[in-house]
From Swiss-Prot:
This is Probable Na(+)/H(+) antiporter nhx-3. The keyword Transcription regulation does not apply. InterPro entries: Cation/H_exchanger_CPA1, Cation/H_exchanger_TM, NaH_exchanger. One of its GO terms (cellular component) is endomembrane system. It comes from Caenorhabditis elegans.
Length: 670
């Protein structure tokens, strides 16, 4: 036994010595090639760098970027990259569905939820809910049923079952919020149309994923193995998954707000909670098989108004920029992978299936929008016009969500290559053809555009006033509409939610709305004025009594300065010189204010806005501000002897030989 152990140790020593000698032959190397150690991270970084440089190049090419959306340009870059990879040994590069749903999709949905204009969404919540839920159900079953009927006549080259085609019809019904935002922000449609298209695209994705998962489970089980209980459970899961995802989003929104509330001692940690907790909401929903898209979208929407009161302005801007950066990187990678997969993925081209899918997508979306708008118009004050219905039908762009779902179809489904090819063709059709032509159509149909100006203070106050007035009308009529719900929520928000979730908010024992507070303030000021008037009248009566008692009134003393000033005021030339001096000073001050406003506008114009509504009008507001400043400069006036005179008129007037006489009162009045 000892001899065997000795032989083993001897062999190990000899082998080690031989290896050391072999390594020693090469000697010391100054540089080492460690590609295997860093190649994955390096490829990802290079990918993002190429995509970012491509977007910069597109932005510099104004004629090209004016007509082609960014998404279509990135797909073109992906096509070029795919052709290059096909000529090399890296032709197997593809987008993994696991990476898509866990790393690329969450930043996009969080960005859409965080920058969602909540007030506009709630005012149109009925239409958004109808379009995203009922519209998605209609498109899924209509497209799937039509393709299934055609397959019975053996018109397609690959067979599929009922649930397999429903899996495909569910994913092809997903309207992409990325493509919708990119297109509709550029054409500056009105807020009513934008919020309906954007809201539908966001929540439509959550509904689509729920349907997709349900039909995929049915397809894997097999229709012959399904029982009525399975169908009932699947239908119930549609509501459980959606509402459960929303509940998780609410819980994590509260957790994020509370976490940021107590970070005043360590402010650097606040942005960490803002990004980690929503992502944990997404992962938690995935873990328990609930809607992760709805979870992170709801979390972003709800936490925004509370975390702004808990963090500094600099931290708020940092959060906005980092959110946008993550979303832009994810969108860029996804669209480039769309172009790449055209040449690198396994395809099965069936022209009849592709053509039928395109036609059914267009026809059934138009039918669904028309019918839903017809029903909604019977119960809405703000009606959907014919032009609005056309843009809603034409704006159903497909994109990243549909592609991510189709590549995650199980390999056991035989028709998967045909589904992938058809999905890519539908995405290309909607992004390129519809995305390019929607701008000319909007201009041709005279679709109402967003007003490129900020609301005045009076408009803001009266908009709030109208909301409360409508709430009062609903209360008098004995009805409970969304105006009453808004009032009740704002009251509950001020009394309970804000004091709990925000740092410097105190519990309010009354309805602390701006209108009521303004009314109470005015009433209090009127009472104070009446008290002062009463006190003044009493003082005047006392002074009158005292003056009657006086034997000799006091004489007013005239100082030498008063005499000198009176002589100066009697000269007309001096008055004209004063006008000239005031005019020059005013013009100089206006120019300084204009230059300062230009600097502020240039600094703030490219800044990220709080939501997508503000982003649509940010660039146009700059021109409006410049026009207002110019108008103020040209219309600046003095009041002289009851006449309006511009500063230019004053300069010309001061050069005349007319020398009017002015009293001290008139100069002070000026």
């Amino acid at each position: 036994m000892l001899s065997k152990l000795f032989v083993f140790l001897l062999i190990c020593y000899a082998t080690a010595d031989e290896v050391d000698k072999k390594e020693a032959k090469h000697g010391f190397q100054l540089f080492h090639w460690n590609w295997d150690h860093i190649h994955k991270v390096y490829v990802i970084t290079t990918w993002l760098l190429v995509a970012s440089l491509a977007k910069i190049l597109f932005n510099l090419m104004k004629p090209l970027s004016k007509w082609l959306p960014d998404s279509s340009l990135l797909i073109i870059v992906g096509l070029g990259l795919g052709y290059f990879l096909n000529q090399t040994t890296l032709s197997g590069v593809h987008l993994d569905s696991h990476a898509f749903f866990l790393y690329l999709l969450p930043p996009i949905i969080f960005d859409a939820g965080y920058f969602m204009p909540n007030r506009a969404l709630f005012k149109n919540f009925d239409s958004v809910l109808v379009f995203s839920v009922l519209g998605t159900l209609w498109n899924t079953f209509a497209i799937g049923g039509s393709l299934l009927i055609m397959s019975k006549y053996q018109l397609f080259t690959m067979p599929f079952t009922t649930f397999e085609i429903l899996v495909f019809s569910a994913l092809i019904s997903a309207v992409d919020p990325v493509a919708v935002i990119a297109i509709f922000e550029e054409i500056h449609v009105n807020e009513f149309l934008f919020i309906n298209v954007f809201g539908e695209a966001l929540f439509n994705d959550g509904v689509t994923v729920v349907l997709y998962q349900m039909f995929k489970s049915f397809a894997l089980i097999g229709s012959e193995n399904l029982s009525p209980w399975d169908y009932a459970t699947g239908g119930l899961s549609f509501f459980v998954v959606a509402l459960g995802g929303a509940a998780i989003g609410i819980i994590f929104a509260i957790a994020t707000s509370l976490a940021t509330k107590y970070t005043q001692g360590i402010k650097i940690l606040a942005p960490v909670f803002i990004f980690l907790l929503p992502y944990m909401a997404y992962l938690t929903a995935e873990m328990v098989s609930l809607s992760s898209i709805i979870a992170i979208a709801v979390c972003g929407m709800l936490m925004k108004q509370y975390i702004k009161g808990n963090i500094t302005e600099a931290a708020t801007n940092s959060v906005k920029y980092f959110t946008k950066m993550l979303a832009q990187c994810s969108e860029t990678v996804i669209f480039m992978f769309l172009g790449l997969s055209t040449l690198t993925s396994e395809h099965h081209v069936d022209f009849i299936f592709i053509g039928a899918t395109l036609v059914f997508c267009l026809i059934y979306r138009a039918i669904g929008i028309i019918v839903q708008c017809f029903i909604l118009n019977k119960f809405r004050a703000k009606k959907f016009e014919v032009v609005d219905q056309f843009i809603l039908s034409y704006g159903g762009l497909r994109g990243a969500i549909a592609y991510g779902l189709v590549v995650s179809i199980p390999a056991s489904i035989q028709a998967k290559p045909m589904f992938i090819t058809t999905t890519i063709c539908v995405i290309y059709f909607t992004v390129f053809l519809q995305g390019i032509t929607i701008r000319p159509l909007v201009n041709c149909l005279n679709v109402k555009k967003k007003e490129h100006r900020e609301a005045t203070m009076v408009e803001s106050v009266y908009n709030k006033y109208l909301d409360y007035m409508m709430s009062g009308v609903e209360d008098i009529a004995g009805q409970r509409g969304h105006y009453s719900f808004i009032e009740n929520f704002e009251r509950f928000n001020a009394k309970v939610i804000k004091p709990v979730l925000m740092r410097h908010e105190k519990r309010q024992s009354f309805d602390a709305t701006s209108i009521i507070r303004a009314y109470e303030k005015i009433t209090l000021e009127d009472a104070i004025k009446l008290t002062k008037v009463k006190s003044t009248l009493q003082n005047k009566r006392l002074e009158k009594v005292k003056s009657e008692v006086r034997v000799a009134p006091e004489q007013t003393t005239v100082t030498p300065k008063d005499v000198q000033l009176a002589r100066f005021m009697q000269s007309g030339e001096n008055i004209d010189q004063l006008y000239t001096l005031f005019s020059d000073l005013l013009d100089k001050k206006l120019n300084e204010l204009k230059v300062q406003a230009d600097k502020v506008d240039k600094a703030n114009d490219d800044d990220i806005q709080d939501d997508y509504m503000a982003e649509m009008g940010s660039h146009s507001n700059l021109g409006f501000m410049h026009h207002s400043a110019d108008q103020l400069d040209s219309d600046s006036v003095f009041q002289r002897r009851g006449r309006r005179l511009s500063t230019g008129d004053l300069k010309g007037h001061c050069g005349t030989s007319r020398k009017p006489k002015h009293s001290m009162f008139e100069l002070r009045h000026v």
